[in-house]
Amino acid sequence: MGPLSAPPCTEHIKWKGLLVTASLLNFWNLPTTAQVTIEAQPPKVSEGKDVLLLVHNLPQNLTGYIWYKGQIRDLYHYITSYVVDGQIIIYGPAYSGRETAYSNASLLIQNVTREDAGSYTLHIIKRGDGTRGVTGYFTFTLYLETPKPSISSSNLNPREAMETVILTCDPETPDTSYQWWMNGQSLPMTHRFQLSETNRTLFLFGVTKYTAGPYECEIRNSGSASRSDPVTLNLLHGPDLPRIHPSYTNYRSGDNLYLSCFANSNPPAQYSWTINGKFQQSGQNLFIPQITTKHSGLYVCSVRNSATGEESSTSLTVKVSASTRIGLLPLLNPT
């Protein structure tokens, strides 16, 4: 974090003792010409880590300084101050016990929390011509590194075109913006999407296969941005009208009959077969070896989706003809 001046090991005074001192220090409010800058080390800090607000180009003849949380300079936002004469540190109402003030005006914040993000104001008081003081105010904004977001859903398994899904980008983070992507692109302009006022929540109306995702959300502040892992909705749909393969209908006695049925469905559909209105078997495939003319009739494949409750069926008329055997003609002996 760079060299620091050791914090004074002298008397610590509670903020109430600052009332008179603060009024005197703030009496003169003239602009300063010192090019004071404040730098965060490290530039991006994660929650739970430490950050140093390092002050550069501190002016000479320093009388003292005051740190405020935010840009309002009052006792409520007062964190700490340092008085050069006597090396006195004074703590205010905004002091959390995690701040350490140094004689070079730098401020160490330990175990950073979300509440620590935001602007800080450094009030520097410099000795003047012996009768007046010169003060300057320098504002710095601390940005926490955005956490990796995640997407929570009110329903990860919606029924197609029937249910509304609410996606939320977590966590809720102050002083950040939220943005959403679908299929790696910005959200299309459609009545099926609606965002909350903060963009943190996305409403999906009547989800279809075209709006099932994948979805990503991003949390961004002025210092960093982080994007979530993609989330794809498991869209429950179907079954569509089933298809029987092969569609061949004419057979001969002694042939093997093999039929397969398929319907697009999520979750996979349940299959059953009937022949001439009589249940034959369950399953997607039907196999009957060495069929006879008795196997002629109407073959129906029925499908059902247990999740959507939808059903569908299709039929195939099979005709089985008797085999015709061609015998050998007798040899005619010439006379």
Curated annotation (Swiss-Prot):
Primary residence: secreted
Domain Ig-like C2-type: from-to ranges: 147-234, 239-317
Localization of this protein: Secreted
Disulfide links within the chain: 169-217, 261-301
Sugar attachment sites: 61, 104, 111, 199
GO CC annotations, alphabetized: cell surface; extracellular region
Signal peptide: 1-34
Coiled-coil region(s): none
Ranges for domain Ig-like V-type: 35-144
Superkingdom of source: Eukaryota
Record family assignment: Belongs to the immunoglobulin superfamily. CEA family.
Protein name listed in UniProt: Pregnancy-specific beta-1-glycoprotein 2
Annotated organism of origin: Homo sapiens
Primary gene name: PSG2
